Amino acid sequence: MSKNYVEMGVYYMDKTIGLVRTVSRMSDYKTNDPMIGFVKVGEGGVASEMYAMPENVFKEKFIH
């Protein structure tokens, strides 16, 4: 896994958020900044609703 690129379909772990899987790339409609769409992976592998986070924030949180 690259240290400066968020890959799609990959699992990432954070102590506060937990296990997530990236599902899409998107853009903020106001600023046109890149965003990452992801789902939280719960007990038994069940996915949550989709969340979005700015790509730079996602990198800081999940890619150390």
Language model features with spans:
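Intrinsically disordered, low-complexity, charged/polar segments
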Residues: 44-64
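Intrinsically disordered, low-complexity sequence elements enriched in Ser/Thr/Gly/Pro
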Residues: 1, 19, 23, 57-59
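Short intrinsically disordered terminal tails
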Residues: 1-4, 63-64
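Basic/aromatic-rich interaction segments and small domains that mediate binding to polyanionic partners
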Residues: 13-51
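Short coil-to-beta transition motif at edge beta-strands of beta-rich domains
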Residues: 3-16
